[in-house]
Regions:
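Active-site nucleophile-adjacent alpha helix/oxyanion-hole segment immediately C-terminal to the catalytic cysteine
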Residues: 2-67, 91
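Intrinsically disordered, low-complexity segments enriched in small/polar residues
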Residues: 5-8, 30, 63, 77, ...
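Cysteine-nucleophile protease catalytic domains, especially the papain-like/related folds used
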Residues: 54-86
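Deubiquitinase catalytic domains
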Residues: 73, 80-137
Length: 137
């Protein structure tokens, strides 16, 4: 279930601090669409399908009554944790995000409701404002 203002509600996601960093990363174009490009690459092998991934996520968010889904349809509007959780739910994926801020290194694992994921997707959140795809953990 998604909260109309902020996104998912009633979810449990896990974080693991100071764990091993990714062994290999696929760089993603940094043009304001990087979350959607990264998800596109992780799912289809082609980051150029980012507009389709963005549209599907927006459709999903609109179906839940999310208030900012229309704004998110614009090219180059950054994706956030809300969109990551929507992707986890609609694609039935565990979206694992590596974040490194100074000396704190954390894997954040975003799961679909009911923990029904069929496969994981690994992303890297670079300094809080860019996403790449982790290709080896």
């Amino acid at each position: 279930m998604f909260n109309k203002k902020s996104g998912p509600s009633g979810r449990t996601n896990k974080s693991y601090k100071n764990t091993s960093e990714p062994l290999a990363v696929q760089p993603i174009v940094g043009d304001g669409n990087c979350l959607f490009r990264a998800l596109s690459f992780a799912i289809t092998g082609d980051e150029e399908q980012h507009a389709v991934v963005r549209s599907l996520i927006c459709d999903f968010l609109e179906s839940t009554g999310h208030q900012k889904a229309g704004e998110l349809r614009q090219n180059k509007v950054w994706g956030t944790t809300t969109e990551i959780l929507a992707a986890a739910e609609m694609f039935q994926l565990n979206v694992c995000v590596w974040a490194s801020f100074g000396r704190v290194h954390t894997w954040h694992i975003h799961k679909p409701k009911g923990d029904t994921a069929t496969q994981p997707v690994y992303l890297e959140n670079k300094i809080g404002n860019h996403f790449n795809v982790v290709t080896r953990v």
